[in-house]
Design a protein with these regions (language model features):
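Domain-level signal for soluble alpha/beta catalytic cores
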Residues: 1-368
Length: 368
């Protein structure tokens, strides 16, 4: 039953030889075909490591991407990636290379999307283990263009009525869900930082000062995501990972889930939530009282630093969470990916696998 008792968010550290190849490609000294060969090799090696650590579902580590979200969103028809003066949110420390998105035409999913080929390659090499595909949530396109970028956003004529924008994003994602399913995908994940931002009181105050009603936007997002999920076949699992920022081991949002819990946990028809709970920035487990029959994957093990968590403490926190959600609905994972962007978090390849081994051991001791 997906998500699995011990699971992953999705991204893994890029090996140095892949980073070197990407730099050579950017300089024009390596062709696209040559880069793809290097990516294929890195993904094959990664999948073997994922299987060796005992994962029930593997990903391609997002090794072909620069960012966890922009690559996919910019591949949608009607969306363009543009350079920016600064990143749309401020991380506490390192800052990513600045880029943003612009909606220039009718939004649609490209049925020849390279992301479908990315999944097909993963499925081809994974053997008999399950394959999980991660893509940014439908909410992310609106968040980047219309919320973070609210002061400069100008709706094209087609989307003067914002309801039309929400609807056509949902339709594009319906097409994406069907297309991934047709390639054999039975485990899809929406990655979403909007909810992390909506939990942060400073950000709520800032957006309110711009005239944005985050509570209404949150309801609109749940409605849009649920519309996208109407395309989900019975035998497909779609989960959501909620993040507060994960670049070079830093973050950009802070605050417990209470401000969004009733709307999101009580209203979103997703199959499971991957929730960050690796620090006090994520608050307590009380908001989980709004969970219905969804699985909750507790991100109790940080992907931001190499220090291994204490098993007893993690087990105690699982017990705490079980006061609000049945133990049988709970699972365990890292708090986020290890490399949400190509730069990666500040830990080693060996460190990330020690974390995964710890997660597996704890899960087996708790759930058997």
């Amino acid at each position: 039953m997906k998500p699995y008792r011990y699971d992953i968010v999705g991204s893994f550290l890029r090996p140095d030889y892949l980073k070197d190849a990407r730099a050579e490609y950017a300089e024009g000294t390596l062709s696209a075909d040559q880069l793809r060969e290097v990516e294929d090799k890195a993904i094959k090696e990664l999948v073997e490591k994922e299987k060796a650590v005992g994962l029930k579902a593997v990903t391609d580590g997002e090794l072909r991407r620069r960012y966890w979200h922009l690559d996919f969103l910019a591949s949608l028809v009607g969306v363009e990636e543009i350079k920016a003066d600064h990143w749309s949110v401020a991380f506490k420390g390192h800052q990513p290379k600045a880029a943003t998105l612009e909606i220039v035409d009718k939004i649609d999913f490209d049925e020849n999307s390279e992301f479908l080929d990315h999944f097909s390659y993963l499925k081809e090499i994974a053997g008999d283990v399950d394959c999980k595909m991660t893509i940014p949530s439908p909410a992310m396109l609106h968040l980047i263009c219309c919320v973070r970028g609210s002061e400069t956003y100008k709706a094209i004529d087609r989307y003067k009525n914002e309801d039309d924008l929400y609807h056509e994003i949902a339709l594009a994602y319906q097409k994406a869900i069907k297309a991934f399913y047709a390639r054999g995908c039975r485990y899809l994940q929406f990655d979403d930082t909007s909810w992390g931002e909506f939990c942060d009181q400073n950000k709520r105050d800032d957006y309110a000062s711009r005239g944005l009603d985050l509570d209404q936007i949150a309801k609109n997002y749940v409605k849009m995501i649920n519309e996208a999920l109407e395309a989900k076949p019975e035998d497909m699992t779609i989960t959501m990972h909620i993040c507060r920022g994960n670049f070079r081991s830093t973050w950009f949002s802070s605050g417990g889930y209470e401000p969004v819990a009733e709307t999101l946990f009580g209203g979103c028809k997703i199959d499971g939530f991957f929730l960050e709970y690796d620090s006090d920035r994520s608050g307590d487990f009380k908001p989980l009282r709004f969970i219905k029959d969804q699985k909750v994957v507790l991100g109790l093990v940080t992907s931001k630093d190499p220090e291994l968590e204490d098993k007893t403490e993690i087990k105690e926190r699982i017990k705490e969470a079980a006061q609000y959600v049945a133990l049988d609905q709970l699972c365990l994972s890292p708090q986020c990916g290890f490399s949400s962007t190509e730069e990666g978090n500040i830990l080693t390849d060996e460190d990330q696998w020690k974390k995964m081994t710890l997660i597996k051991e704890i899960a087996e001791e708790v759930w058997g």
